[in-house]
A protein has these predicted regions:
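Non-catalytic terminal accessory segments
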Residues: 1-135, 382-400
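Soluble catalytic domains of enzymes that build or remodel membrane lipids, polysaccharides, and related
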Residues: 138-139, 143-400
């Protein structure tokens, strides 16, 4: 959408919320305060959008960008709650035509109007706290049929959708790296949408990823946001940091007499940006040993159909953020076959991470961020139920 239509639509949505809520608050000072907050949120929106394209250079610009992004999260809750209120009042009015006096519409309108700012503020503050804290560790056992004994207990740590950019900087990334390094991983998988910005602006903030530790190294695949941010430059930068970037490629890891193929595809939408980089699970697997366990890193869950057809055993994805906050955790299901967790797709397992950071507004509500520790176990052994825990100390693993 072009800037002017986007601004016009945004203005109409803000005006709708202001009209429906402010007019129902029942006190002039409440209405004035609500309109002032709404106006501040609207006026700082351009700074939020600008920060997604280029790093703010001045402290005031950074403050305005933060204000715009927090305000965007607040407004999303205000809009949803206002629509729900109007639907509820409409239903109450219909009931009142059948049962006159059965519904106290005036009281309902007043109380619901006053509840909207309070609920939206609560959700936004709690969502901010959830987004800004370091992701908890989610532990998942993946049952694999005919798993070679040498791969029993193989540990994969997945991080995804960090979105280093306007509000996620080096300290946030350093905390993630420290948490991952305590998990004694065999392999670290970074499943795309690492950045929202150029190498020039963000290289210093991504640099801590070079300190990730595991036995077999760190592997990265592109997400759609890498293509918005200069994918070729980021692939070069990550390789410079010692991170293996898989572009429809694979490597073979050995454990005794067992092998595991670690393959990665470009983002599902990469072909729209560069036809030569179209996502291709079959090509990623070409030339791999046929008897090996096959693991695919694919940013979007909808790669699953092609991945299963190519013969993969397990796909690790992200992209969805689990919806990040209401109501998107319901709407994301319209675009992706899986939104979060371990799911079976025909003969293949798919694990979809809710993401380790966040995108846009610093807000997570109903979809907590995660660092995922996946453990391969034989299918005949009961898998442990997924659990959430803060990172725990573990023996140091040797470097990448």
């Amino acid at each position: 959408m072009r800037p002017m239509p986007l601004r016009a639509v945004s203005f109409l949505l803000y005006a709708y919320v202001g009209w429906r809520v402010a007019s129902g608050l029942g006190a002039v000072w409440m209405s004035a305060a609500f309109v002032a907050v709404l106006a501040l949120s609207f006026l700082t929106l351009p700074f939020a959008f600008r920060a997604r394209r280029a790093e703010p250079a001045r402290p005031l610009e950074r403050l305005l960008a933060w204000s715009g992004l927090v305000g965007m999260g607040l407004f999303s809750s205000l809009l949803v709650l206002t629509v729900v209120r109007d639907l509820a009042l409409g239903a109450a009015a219909l009931i009142a035509t059948v049962v006159p006096g059965g519904v106290p519409i005036a009281t309902l309108a007043l109380l619901s109007a006053r509840a909207i700012p309070l609920v939206a503020a609560f959700v936004t503050v709690l969502g901010f706290v959830n987004a800004r804290r370091t992701a908890a560790v989610v532990r998942v056992d993946v049952p694999v049929a005919d798993l070679p004994p040498a791969l029993d207990g193989f540990r994969i740590v997945q991080i995804s959708d960090i979105h280093v950019g306007p509000t996620i900087k080096r300290p946030y990334v350093e905390a993630i790296v420290a948490a991952v390094n305590r998990l004694d991983a065999d392999l670290v998988a970074v499943t795309g949408d690492l950045v929202d910005g150029s190498v020039r602006d963000l290289a210093e903030h991504v640099a801590p990823l070079a300190e990730l530790r595991s036995r077999d190294g760190t592997f990265f695949v592109t997400g759609n946001h890498e293509y918005y941010s200069g994918a070729a430059a980021w692939v070069s930068e990550l390789r410079r940091l010692g991170i293996t970037t898989l572009m429809n490629q694979h490597v073979v890891l050995r454990r005794g007499d067992a092998a595991i193929v670690v393959a990665g595809v470009t983002d599902f939408s990469a072909g729209h940006f560069d036809r030569d980089q179209a996502s291709d699970p079959q090509r990623a697997l070409a030339g791999s040993p046929p008897a090996a366990l096959r693991l695919l890193l694919a940013h979007q869950p909808r790669s699953a159909e092609a991945a299963e057809a190519a013969g993969f055993d397990l796909q690790l994805s992200g992209h969805t953020h689990g919806g990040q906050f209401l109501p998107w955790n319901f709407l994301v299901r319209l675009q992706q076959p899986f939104t979060a967790g371990l799911k079976r797709w025909r003969r293949m397992w798919v694990y979809t991470s809710r993401g380790t950071g966040y995108w846009g507004p610093p807000k997570r509500f109903g979809a907590p961020s995660e660092i995922t520790l996946l453990r391969l176990v034989p299918a005949h052994r009961p898998a442990a139920a997924p659990s959430r825990a803060t990172p725990r100390p573990a023996p140091a693993a040797r470097g990448v």
